[in-house]
Each structure stands twice: as structure tokens, then as C-alpha cells.
Amino acid sequence: MAAPPLDVGLVPPSTEVAATNGAIPGYPAPGQPSNMTVPGSWYGYPSLLPVVAIQPDWLEVRLAQRPNGSTTWVQASDVTLSTTPYAIVIDLSTEHLTVYQSGLQIYDFPAGIGTPDDPTPTGSYFMTMKVPPPSPAYGAFVLATSDHSDSITDWENSGDAIIGIHGPITSYDDSLIGTTGAAISHGCVRLHDADLALLTTIPAGTPINIIS
């Protein structure tokens, strides 16, 4: 099931985030039999899932798995709720990444986005985890998202092709990003190292809307 995309004109002042208490059942709709298991962790990091709909005793949450945009319903008693005041919007047409806090814009960065052959998929996603970079070229950290490449299924024998937000990789790509952004990646979103560093406090579960 896919939830409606975030209306970029109405960036929410906050988003509720559900932390699973271990692996829990997921449901196609409230009151129906369970049809899946929501993992308690994702690549070793706790599952922190943004809430997109609420009914009495039930929550609809986004999932980090393929297909892109997947959601499921969970019982409210199976999760612990917190709140993130942040939201990220990545505009592929302007090649910029914008960060909002409590509904107000706080950052706007030029970004490297996917090329026409390996585009950055549009849709409504979330930040799943902040992980150490595979090398210093990726910046101080990588923000992994729930977005997955549509053109690549196995990036460098990793078993998947998850869209990340990270540094520019090379000085040449850094120069291409410049002040306006550029289509230079295999789908990931690249930022200047100094801009990426400003995102260190963005928590897992923060919604990310990628628009064209």
C-alpha cells in the first residue's frame, strides 16, 4: 500500500515517528489479519517509521523496503511514538535539497542528483539511518533513505541499491554541484561536505519528499 505524497506546499511542522518494539506484525488495514512482519531493525539500526495515518488503536507507517512508497498498518500498542520537527524536500527540477524545521525553511543546498540513465526516484520517503561513510570521499556520514533505485538492483554487491544523501565523492563532482546543482550520480543525492555536515542532527524517521 502506498500513502499519498507529502504536499510540498504544506510541509508539516512535525511528524510522529513509530519505533517498533522488536519485530511486529503488519496489517493491510485495521482489524484485518496480519500479512507481513515489520522488522525491528533495518541493516542493524532500529526501525523508526514515520506515521502517515491514524485510526483508534492503529497507525499507518512508511516502510524502508521495496517497492518504493510501501506502507503498512500496525497496532499502536506495538510501537513507541516520538516526534521529529524536520522535513526534507529534494527538488529534481531545481537540483536543490531544502530542509524544514517546524514547518520553516532552515537550509537550501545545491545537490548532485541522478543522471537520466540512473535517476533519483521521486516519491515520499524517510531517513532510515545515519551510517559511517564507506570512505572519506562520502563526507562525515551517509544519510540512508527508504528510497531505492529503479534502475539498479544491486549496487557493488550490496544486495540492494538504496538512495543515500552524502558528500560529493570527488573534487570534480564537487565543482559540478557548485551553487546550482547537477545531475551527476547513480541516484544518490550528493552535497558539499560543509552542507552535509549541517544535517548531522536530522533524526531517523524524518520525512523526505522527492519531487520533479
Task: Describe each model-derived feature in a short phrase.
Residues 70, 75-81, 89, 104-105, ...:
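Post-signal peptide N-terminal regions of Sec-secreted extracellular proteins
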